[in-house]
Amino acid sequence: MNYLTLAIGTAIILLFSWYFSIREGRYHGIARFFSFESIFILVLLNWRLWFKDPFSGFQIISWVLLIASIYPGIAGYLTLHKKGKPEDNHIERTTVIVKSGIYKYIRHPLYCSLLLLGTGVMFKDPGKLQLVCGAVNLLAIYFTARLEEKEMIKKFGPGYIQYMYETKMFIPYIF
């Protein structure tokens, strides 16, 4: 692993986390930092094997997860941007609870996307360190979602609590 690349990437992720969440008191950005960081480390560990042995079981699982990560990420972002009435065009500053599109089924499509992405990158070469990074990503995403839900309850009150009862976190009808 190239440690200079790791240091530069980590600095960028820290700045992103600070600018878009933490500085405004949205502390779910701290947990989300660990998700971004674990995915970044997984990419650094596995990039050389991205296309090696493309028909192995792990590669097939990896590509299915990577491709599956695209839809919830794009659909979630576009729906938040269009329906969330964000202040200053910033999706973390939505002014209404979005309950349409993919948000009709899951509350956290962007985090679902990160979950699928991180797991897909991990499956490129699922060694011990990669499994640890994959577990960190899973835990970080779960805690990010829980922290964000507390923030949304403060912001939107009982309406968000009702929305939580109507939808699942990451997987429609399951979890």
Predicted regions and their residues:
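Membrane-anchoring alpha-helices and their flanking helix-loop junctions
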Residues: 1-96, 116-175
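Active-site-proximal inter-transmembrane loops
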Residues: 90-110
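Hydrophobic alpha-helical membrane segments
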Residues: 109-117
